[in-house]
């Protein structure tokens, strides 16, 4: 079967995602589309809009996604280059012939050229990075500014282009394909037929209804429990105010400069938004801080990440699939173990802890039993 992969979060799956999957299927000649989707927490360090099982089921219900595989926590809640490398590693390991991604650019050649230039290895890039860091910028912001100074063929200040660049850097055996993003941009909160996931979540927060989704996807999500960061803040605050300083610095991303700042912010602020306003700086951006807080919430220590190889995976885990996806899983099993039931794999044990950290603040105790969850089988889904 000719397989095209899409690295995704589907937070939630919306009309723009549906458009991308349709175009990817048409232009790559794919027999099936497999989504490699982050789980309960996202790349930007946010609790997913709803749990991974429901999001995966909603994607398959659209009729364009045949199989959803989980992007493990260690790959998912990461800066862009590691997120991309982890996703590409899975796509190539399962035998996908193509990797499709949305981009603001919409043309593949600039990504190939930028990746081949490898500007990150040049002295000029390193000089610009150091200048940015010296001005108090975060690593991600300093990198964005450096790329802006050096690159003329590709705008790497936009989120989808940035991920596309790192996909191109990571790709070894897979053919790349890009679809121009249509409709709202990532941070655009305007409403319409094709809205950003950010706008859909914001609209739901104020109107308590879902718009901008395919009909069958919306139906799947109708009775879901939706998350925001606010219910998690009391748990994060408790840990910040009760953990000794030296122990706090064992968590991934927390150093001697950040730890006191987090403690002071937690001591003085009763809401998550006020806490973030007090703590974030040019160096500590909201996104990087959110990832740190997720590491804290999930008890993820720096030592856990020391031996993570982002270019290697020894299992895949399906979250949802249809008849076409089931056929694909048979082929994938010839390449790599497919874990559909819970096993005592260290990463799956971690996933159970991560799922508990996601579920308890939402009082979703029915979602605690990760070891009893099976991939959702949708059967035949009409397109």
UniProtKB/Swiss-Prot annotation:
Its EC number is 6.3.4.-. SUPFAM superfamilies: Nucleotidylyl transferase. GO terms for cellular component: cytoplasm. It catalyses: cytidine(34) in elongator tRNA(Met) + acetate + ATP = N(4)-acetylcytidine(34) in elongator tRNA(Met) + AMP + diphosphate. Keywords: ATP-binding, Cytoplasm, Ligase, Nucleotide-binding, RNA-binding, tRNA processing, tRNA-binding. Its main location: cytoplasm. Gene3D superfamilies: HUPs. Signal peptide: none annotated. GO terms for molecular function: ATP binding; ligase activity, forming carbon-nitrogen bonds; tRNA binding. ATP binds at residues 7-20, 102, 160, 181-182. GO terms for biological process: tRNA modification. It is found in: Cytoplasm. Pfam families: HIGH_NTase1. Belongs to the TmcAL family. Catalyzes the formation of N(4)-acetylcytidine (ac(4)C) at the wobble position of elongator tRNA(Met), using acetate and ATP as substrates. First activates an acetate ion to form acetyladenylate (Ac-AMP) and then transfers the acetyl group to tRNA to form ac(4)C34. This is tRNA(Met) cytidine acetate ligase. It comes from Exiguobacterium sibiricum (strain DSM 17290 / CCUG 55495 / CIP 109462 / JCM 13490 / 255-15).
């Amino acid at each position: 079967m000719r397989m095209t992969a899409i690295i995704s979060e589907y937070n939630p799956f919306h009309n723009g995602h549906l458009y991308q999957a349709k175009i990817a299927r048409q232009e790559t000649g794919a027999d099936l589309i497999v989504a490699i989707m982050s789980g309960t927490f996202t790349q930007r360090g946010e609790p997913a809009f709803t749990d991974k099982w429901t999001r995966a089921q909603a994607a398959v219900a659209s009729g364009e996604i045949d199989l959803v595989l989980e992007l493990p926590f260690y790959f998912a809640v990461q800066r862009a280059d590691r997120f991309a490398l982890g996703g590409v590693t899975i796509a190539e390991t399962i035998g996908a012939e193509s990797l499709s991604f949305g981009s603001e650019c919409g043309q593949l050649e600039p990504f190939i050229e930028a990746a081949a230039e490898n500007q990150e290895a040049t002295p000029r890039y390193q000089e610009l990075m150091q200048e940015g860091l010296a001005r108090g910028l975060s690593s991600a912001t300093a990198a964005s500014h450096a790329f802006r100074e050096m690159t003329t063929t590709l705008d790497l200040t936009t989120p989808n282009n940035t991920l596309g660049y790192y996909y191109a850097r990571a790709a070894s055996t897979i053919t790349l394909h890009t679809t121009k993003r249509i409709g709202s941009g990532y941070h655009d909160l305007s409403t319409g037929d094709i809205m950003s996931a950010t706008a859909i979540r914001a609209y739901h927060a104020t109107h308590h209804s879902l718009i901008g989704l395919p009909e069958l996807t919306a139906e799947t999500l109708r009775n879901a429990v939706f998350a925001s960061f606010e219910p998690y803040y009391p748990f994060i605050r408790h840990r910040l105010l009760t953990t000794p300083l030296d122990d706090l610095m064992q968590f991934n991303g927390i150093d001697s400069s950040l730890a006191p700042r987090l403690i002071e912010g937690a001591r003085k602020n009763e809401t998550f938004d006020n806490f973030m306003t007090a703590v974030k700086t040019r160096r500590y951006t909201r996104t990087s801080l959110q990832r740190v807080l997720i590491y804290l919430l999930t008890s993820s220590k720096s030592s856990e990440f020391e031996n993570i190889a982002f270019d290697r995976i020894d299992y895949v885990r399906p979250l949802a699939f249809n008849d076409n996806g089931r056929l694909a899983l048979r082929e994938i099993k010839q390449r790599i173990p497919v874990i559909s039931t819970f096993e005592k794999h260290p990463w799956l044990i971690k996933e159970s802890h991560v799922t508990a950290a996601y579920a308890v603040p939402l009082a979703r105790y029915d979602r605690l039993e990760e070891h009893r969850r099976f991939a959702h089988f949708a059967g035949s889904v009409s397109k």
